[in-house]
């Protein structure tokens, strides 16, 4: 088959694919007779984007006069053989660059006996000098070329790429080879992670690591994964959040700490949820939730400017036309009840002051309720149904009910709510933060209430953590803490419609099931 028609397994007839594999293995066998087809002694000195940065503004005459020599390496993505000369496109971590190969520039017989037998997907090392073709394309005039890795399987077809999302996630390595957009997504993810660390480090935060396996899972309301430690002969849990350990560190005197790491929750998979996900959590002593909102606003504005060169980005949730999100304007702030009244249409404020009234509102809006719920639970469920999806521009929702905020400090003016916010963009929760509860007796009572909910059938209710209560009894300074979902943040900055597009290897059902 021709190189122009090479396609991945899903696109090929089984017999055609088998023939392709047979041909490539035969080529590999022949190459082995002439030396090692997998050498490891080639060292490049530049990558493609560096070449473009250095020479894109050079004219054909300037390049010819300078004759700048380079050593590059990459995967053959396209090739045009024209008798005694060929053009090929190499792809590396920086992008793509064209190479020009002629028979006369290579050792006798090499062009026909080796180079022309290489396939798309093979990885080569090239030495040569920069020049510009008559059509104006920056290229490397090859003076030496070596095969570094023989590919036995064909690349995804170049015009279609790897378009099936399931296949893209399952074979991410092929997705990264074939789709420039996917490579860009994960490059931006790296920028987000680095940007967050740089920002927090500049604010005198210290990065720490806390246990991934815990005897008592805490810090969030979620169903944990359970494992067993053979040496200790105890069940342990993959962490659902690092919060309680980070606050222990604040008790110990590390007054500004953060952690960027994985959390695990044994729950459903959706466009917004993956059971293994990346979370930033940070805590600062002598601060409250208002300080966190200010810090979050500054951090996200800085990230947007540094990554995209502007504080305005476009986000198209679920494949819609999209909206412009402006990080340059002050972020909106409203209470949970205010948001329900704004977006709930027929909801009256007095209805949200009693359990009976709130249940009536919930029924009108077809909100499913649990019998054990208090007023705060019902109000939160109404908010999630009526208002959450309407919060397109950056918005902080404050005054979360104490019933759904077991770790947050109660509001001084209204103890039924807490000094807590959740942050929304594009109709999705991005962050959760609050002034920390540092009253050990109040915390113990709330843990006991969570235990009662768990006994009533709520699998996501928290365990009682006696050691954490003990830590609070030693004194936690006034503290504020926050968690930001990195995956959802990357979805926003890359205009991705599903969380699977921003996680390199997301959870998938086995292909044989």
Curated annotation (Swiss-Prot):
It is an enzyme of class 6 (ligase). Its main location: cytoplasm. InterPro entries: Aa-tRNA-synt_II, aa-tRNA-synth_II, aa-tRNA-synth_II/BPL/LPL, Lys-tRNA-ligase_II, Lys-tRNA-ligase_II_bac/euk, Lys-tRNA-ligase_II_N, Lys-tRNA-synth_II_C, NA-bd_OB-fold. Binds 3 Mg(2+) ions per subunit. GO terms for cellular component: cytosol. One of its GO terms (molecular function) is magnesium ion binding. It catalyses: tRNA(Lys) + L-lysine + ATP = L-lysyl-tRNA(Lys) + AMP + diphosphate. GO terms for biological process: lysyl-tRNA aminoacylation. The keyword Amino-acid biosynthesis does not apply. It holds the Pfam family tRNA_anti-codon. Belongs to the class-II aminoacyl-tRNA synthetase family. Homodimer. This is Lysine--tRNA ligase. It comes from Tolumonas auensis (strain DSM 9187 / NBRC 110442 / TA 4).
């Amino acid at each position: 088959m021709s190189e122009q028609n090479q396609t991945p397994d899903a696109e090929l007839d089984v017999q055609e694919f088998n023939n392709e594999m047979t041909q490539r293995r035969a080529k590999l066998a022949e190459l082995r007779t002439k030396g090692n087809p997998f050498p490891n002694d080639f060292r490049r000195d530049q990558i493609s984007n560096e070449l473009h940065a250095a020479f894109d503004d050079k004219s054909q005459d300037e390049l010819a006069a300078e004759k700048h020599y380079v050593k590059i390496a990459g995967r053959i993505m396209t090739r045009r053989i024209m008798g005694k000369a060929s053009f090929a496109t190499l792809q590396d971590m920086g992008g793509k660059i064209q190479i020009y190969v002629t028979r006369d520039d290579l050792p006798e017989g090499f062009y026909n006996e080796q180079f022309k037998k290489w396939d798309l997907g093979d990885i080569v090392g090239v030495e040569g000098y920069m020049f510009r073709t008559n059509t104006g394309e920056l290229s490397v005039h090859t003076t030496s070329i070596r095969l570094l890795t023989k590919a036995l399987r064909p690349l995804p077809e170049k015009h279609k790429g790897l378009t099936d999302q399931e296949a893209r996630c399952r074979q991410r390595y092929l997705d990264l080879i074939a789709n420039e957009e996917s490579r860009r997504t994960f490059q931006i993810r790296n920028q987000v992670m680095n940007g967050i660390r740089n920002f927090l480090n500049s604010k005198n935060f210290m990065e720490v690591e806390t246990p991934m396996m815990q005897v008592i899972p805490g810090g969030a309301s979620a169903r944990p994964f359970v494992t067993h430690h053979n040496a200790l002969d105890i069940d342990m849990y993959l962490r659902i959040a690092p919060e309680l350990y980070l606050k222990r560190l604040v008790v110990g005197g590390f007054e500004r700490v953060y952690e960027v790491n994985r959390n695990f929750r044994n729950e459903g998979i959706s466009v917004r949820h993956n059971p293994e996900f990346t979370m930033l959590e940070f805590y600062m002593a002598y601060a409250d939730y208002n300080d966190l909102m200010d810090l979050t606003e500054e951090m996200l504005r800085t990230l947007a400017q540094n990554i995209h060169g502007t504080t305005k980005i476009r986000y198209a949730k679920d494949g819609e036309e999209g909206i412009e999100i402006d990080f340059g304007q002050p972020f909106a702030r409203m209470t949970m009840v205010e948001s329900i009244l704004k977006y709930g249409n027929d909801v009256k404020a007095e209805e949200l002051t009693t359990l009976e009234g709130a249940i009536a509102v919930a029924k009108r809006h077809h909100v499913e309720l649990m019998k054990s719920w208090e007023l705060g639970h019902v109000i939160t469920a109404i908010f999630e149904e009526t208002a959450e999806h309407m919060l397109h521009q950056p918005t902080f929702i404050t005054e979360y009910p104490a019933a759904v905020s077991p770790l947050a400090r109660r509001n001084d003016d209204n103890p039924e709510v807490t000094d807590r916010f959740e942050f929304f963009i594009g109709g999705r929760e991005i962050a959760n933060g609050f002034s920390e509860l540092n009253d050990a007796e109040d915390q113990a009572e709330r843990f006991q209430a969570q235990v009662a909910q768990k006994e009533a059938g709520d699998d996501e209710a928290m365990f009682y953590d006696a050691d954490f209560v003990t830590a609070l009894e030693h004194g936690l300074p006034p503290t504020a803490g926050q968690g930001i979902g990195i995956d959802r943040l990357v979805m926003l900055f890359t205009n991705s419609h599903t969380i699977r597009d921003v996680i390199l290897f997301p959870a998938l059902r086995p292909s044989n099931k």
